[in-house]
């Protein structure tokens, strides 16, 4: 669920069906009306951009391109070649929490050696933790942390010739506001897609 391909989309409410270009393909029983104009009832277009392998959508056609908004993040993450990473599995979780608290928690790794001492914190030292500065007009924040060279995960595969030196065992944690958060490691990537389920 949440991925794949199709040639059409069908609304689960009235069963109107749209082609992937947004044109209305079918609308059951609407031929019985005298004002139905299929050509005028397509989906509204949404601007879509691909940045570093991620698909970003915006309803605001006047907003600057994603690559411009995230320009100072690009040199930090492009060395990983994340656009070549592949999905291995997905999970869905429901948490009884305020999504903003989850975002705040994700944006700092100061807690890792304590709260996650049996997992990622076991191969991480606060002294090596670095944070990128967030300017007034920034649309993102990031931090990166270097794991010990003997860490069981988070290290580049021997055949990886993109990453050199300390970057072979350094992970980056970007947060693109308001809710795109992920861990980009030399050997894997995982992300959170937050969808608040009420107020």
Region annotations inferred by a language model:
Residues 1-61, 67-75:
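Rieske [2Fe-2S] iron-sulfur-binding domain
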Residues 49, 54, 58-199:
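C-terminal catalytic domain of Rieske-type non-heme iron oxygenases
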């Amino acid at each position: 669920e949440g991925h794949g391909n199709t040639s059409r989309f069908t609304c689960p409410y009235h069963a109107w069906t749209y082609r992937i270009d947004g044109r209305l393909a079918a609308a059951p029983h609407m031929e019985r009306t005298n004002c139905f104009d299929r050509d005028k009832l397509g989906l509204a277009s949404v601007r879509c951009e691909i940045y570093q392998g991620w698909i970003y959508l915006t309803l605001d056609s006047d907003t600057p391109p994603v690559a411009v908004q995230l320009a100072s993040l690009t040199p930090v993450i492009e060395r990983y070649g994340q656009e070549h990473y592949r999905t291995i599995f997905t999970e869905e979780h429901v948490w009884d929490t305020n999504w903003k608290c989850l975002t705040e928690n994700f944006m700092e790794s100061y807690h890792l050696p304590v709260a996650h001492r049996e997992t990622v914190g076991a191969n991480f030292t606060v002294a090596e933790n670095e944070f990128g500065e967030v300017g007034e007009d920034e649309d993102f924040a990031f931090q990166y942390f270097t794991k010990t060279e003997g860490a069981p995960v988070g290290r580049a595969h021997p055949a990886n010739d993109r990453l050199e030196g300390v970057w072979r065992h350094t992970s980056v944690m970007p947060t693109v506001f308001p809710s795109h958060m992920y861990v980009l490691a030399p050997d894997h990537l995982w992300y959170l897609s937050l969808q608040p389920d009420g107020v």
